[in-house]
Amino acid sequence: MGKYFGTDGVRGEANVELTPEMAFKLGRFGGYVLSQHELGTPKVYVGRDTRISGQMLASSLISGLLSVGIEVYDLGVIATPGVAYLVKKDGASAGVMISASHNPALDNGIKFFGGDGYKLEDEKELEIEALIDAEEDTLPRPSAQGLGMLHDYIEGVRKYQAFLKTTAEGNFEGYKVVLDTANGAAYTSARAVFADLEANLTVIGENPDGLNINVKVGSTHPEAMAKKVVETGSDLGLAFDGDADRLIAVDENGEIVDGDKIMFIVGKYLLGQGKLAQDTLVTTVMSNLGFHLALEEAGINSVITAVGDRYVVEEMKKNNYNFGGEQSGHMIFLDYNTTGDGQLSAIQLLKVMRETGKSLSELASEVTIYPQKLVNVRVKDNAAKKSAMDVPAIQKVISEMETSMNGKGRILVRPSGTEPLLRVMAEAPTHEEVNHVVDTIVEVVEAEIGVK
């Protein structure tokens, strides 16, 4: 990670850390880096989620892109994977998404996709950062001829919807489904897609006002959806996050089905169809021990990466795997798209239910999840989170807790990729043990580097 770019683009509090001035620079310098070798006029797609700051940042970013001669196509409010899909399909030079995903409305972010639809490599991000930090802006400044033009590309959302529907390979007639679009980007597509696929729908989190994105709705707050599933007697609920690159489901009983369980369900189905490349699923260090045991029993190999969907995708590309994801709900189907896609994942999950004739609770019951506890400790700043593992007291308590578990569980302490948080996670055979381990470590972390 560089000075400005984290694991998922540039993030910060809108108009405080991520300012219009920074957005302009990212547009100008990012656009130049991504299009400097184009033979014709470069074309860049820009999308955003529903945050109130999205229009402000989009205006500045687009101005920066236009200033270096780039033709900009404004997609408006669209899911992050929609930008990635359209860039690759239409042969655009690059794409930019303005979103802070599952973060609250006061935050925003800017992430770039290359012409191949994948997130930028570290080298390209460092090149952009070097231009931002240079003492002088030496990039071309055309005055009339050579400036870019801005085009509305609202039909891009409809193209993305059409693509999603083709992946269902049939319809979902007879299924009662609750959708939760998190008052976010999926509100422009999810209802239309699943209605066209003939599901019987109830939709919540579909009234964005610029401030309510992810507030008590969406994949990080599936409780409202779970309640609605039970109330309506639905077959399942499908919750997306603010930019709709994640999916968390709930079964017909209102029980949460997280990314681990969804990956197992879909991975096992793909294996049975001979469509799981190298019989392997790529996941991260956050995936539950019970998930790995279920994979082993099903005859599925697993490859484990660092946390972050970009690392899952890197591993998949490097070794030609086609399915992977994270416990948090990012799932990547490289046969269909280049990045995590919540709506695509939802369609694939429903497809497994349709093809097997099984309920979601029945499919999910094959994975026995170890009790897991995750606590996010807010620390003083990003420097504190990065150096946390060098603090002797923190090292000592982790070592003591690992010894006490005697190999029957695991501990993971890591910095957040996007916020000043230290994530403390443990798994153990019992809730009592996992609570003791996490609470003991959290107490020391808060004392040493926590926000007082």
Curated annotation (Swiss-Prot):
Protein family according to the UniProt entry: Belongs to the phosphohexose mutase family.
Phylogenetic lineage: Bacteria, Bacillati, Bacillota, Bacilli, Lactobacillales
One of the record's GO cellular component terms: cytosol
Domain of life according to the entry: Bacteria
Alphabetized InterPro entries for the sequence: A-D-PHexomutase_a/b/a-I, A-D-PHexomutase_a/b/a-I/II/III, A-D-PHexomutase_a/b/a-II, A-D-PHexomutase_a/b/a-III, A-D-PHexomutase_C, A-D-PHexomutase_C_sf, A-D-PHexomutase_CS, Alpha-D-phosphohexomutase_SF
Post-translational modification: Activated by phosphorylation.
One GO MF term attached to the UniProt entry: phosphomannomutase activity
Top enzyme class: isomerase
HAMAP family (UniProt xref): GlmM_B (MF_01554_B)
GO terms, biological process: carbohydrate metabolic process; peptidoglycan biosynthetic process; UDP-N-acetylglucosamine biosynthetic process
Residue list for modification Phosphoserine: 101
Substrates-to-products reaction catalysed: alpha-D-glucosamine 1-phosphate = D-glucosamine 6-phosphate
Keywords: Isomerase, Magnesium, Metal-binding, Phosphoprotein
Cofactor annotation comment: Binds 1 Mg(2+) ion per subunit.
Short name of any one Pfam family annotated for the protein: PGM_PMM_II
Enzyme active site: 101 (phosphoserine intermediate)
Biological role stated in the UniProt entry: Catalyzes the conversion of glucosamine-6-phosphate to glucosamine-1-phosphate.
Binding residue positions for Mg(2+): 101, 241, 243, 245
Cofactor: Mg(2+)
PANTHER family hit by this protein: PHOSPHOGLUCOMUTASE (ALPHA-D-GLUCOSE-1,6-BISPHOSPHATE-DEPENDENT) (PTHR42946:SF1), PHOSPHOHEXOSE MUTASE (PTHR42946)
Name the record gives this protein: Phosphoglucosamine mutase
Keyword Phosphoprotein among UniProt keywords: yes
EC number of this enzyme: 5.4.2.10
Keyword Cell cycle among record annotations: no
CDD domains: GlmM
